[in-house]
């Protein structure tokens, strides 16, 4: 029994030590967008785990946000296809910084497009966790006049908006070896920063394949713009379904042929 236990411990150590050595030896490199907040968010969101600043994680966004309530953001980690466990994105100087926790699975590429709100000029980060336990951090800067997080809702000014909550518009479009699913979801995405209006936002989404398997999971946060626009790249065959839930427990379901 003692011999078997020693063998098991030896096997565990043999598997763990290379990863531990990798974690200790990693050199993060220079922050491409130096920020006084990086150390805080490294601890807050990544639990001070090993990381590298990596230009292979691409964040595409306009240099200046003309409308700070609707800022297009594209996160591209396809350089790590097949090895991505999750992608975390945040805006460092937002009052509500976290944007999305995206977990692509088999059949979905590590690429995501959405629209966000920013309150002021800020560094944007996307941290990609790969299956070797290392975070790869992509960065960019965006300038803005500001006010995107505290601006009143446009959705709530439209007559009968409550009747359309959860409606999904969009489709699936071929793009060579994969297809792109692009949707817009009717929802005010209230972030609780406008007087008299509590938080009311979509906080969870699943993309499912034709046999019900989960292709991707997303945790959404109030930094996502109202009437969220989401896009995914899929290389799985057949139709898909988008299943959504908001923080009030409402659930929505849409078929995407």
Where does each model-flagged region fall?
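N-terminal edge beta-strand
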Residues: 41-66, 158-174
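Surface-exposed, short loops/turns at beta-strand junctions within beta-sandwich domains
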Residues: 115-121, 233-238
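Short acidic/polar inter-strand loop motif in beta-rich domains
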Residues: 131-137, 246-254
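Low-complexity, Pro/Ser/Thr- and charge-rich linker/hinge segments at domain boundaries
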Residues: 28-34, 145-170, 176-178
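Short amphipathic, basic-aromatic surface patches that mediate peripheral association
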Residues: 184-196
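Structural beta-strand segments of beta-rich domains
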Residues: 69-73, 177-181
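Aromatic sugar-binding surface patches on proteins
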Residues: 105-112, 222-233
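Short beta-strand edge segments in extracellular beta-sheet folds
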Residues: 141-147, 257
């Amino acid at each position: 029994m003692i011999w078997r236990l020693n063998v098991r411990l030896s096997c565990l150590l043999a598997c763990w030590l290379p990863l531990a050595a990798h974690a200790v030896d990693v050199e993060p490199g220079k922050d491409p967008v130096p920020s006084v907040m990086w150390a805080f968010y490294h601890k807050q969101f990544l639990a001070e785990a090993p990381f590298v600043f990596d230009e292979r994680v691409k964040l595409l966004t306009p240099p200046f946000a003309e409308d700070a309530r609707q800022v297009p953001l594209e996160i591209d980690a396809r350089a790590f296809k097949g090895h991505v466990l999750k992608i975390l994105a945040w805006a460092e100087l937002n009052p509500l910084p976290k944007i999305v926790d995206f977990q692509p699975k088999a059949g979905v590429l590590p690429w995501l497009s959405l629209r966000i709100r920013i309150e002021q000029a800020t560094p944007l980060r996307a941290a990609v966790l790969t299956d070797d336990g290392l975070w790869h951090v992509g960065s960019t800067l965006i300038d803005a006049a500001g006010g995107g997080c505290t601006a009143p809702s446009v959705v709530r000014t439209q007559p009968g908006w409550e009747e359309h909550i959860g409606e999904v518009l969009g489709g699936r479009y071929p793009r060579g070896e994969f297809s792109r699913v692009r949707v817009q979801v009717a929802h005010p995405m209230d972030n609780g920063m406008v007087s008299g209006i509590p938080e009311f936002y979509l906080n969870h989404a699943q993309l499912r394949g034709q046999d019900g398997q989960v292709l991707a999971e997303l945790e959404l946060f109030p930094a996502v713009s109202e009437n969220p626009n989401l896009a995914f790249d899929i290389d799985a065959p057949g139709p898909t379904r988008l299943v959504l839930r908001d923080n009030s427990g409402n659930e929505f379901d849409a078929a995407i042929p």
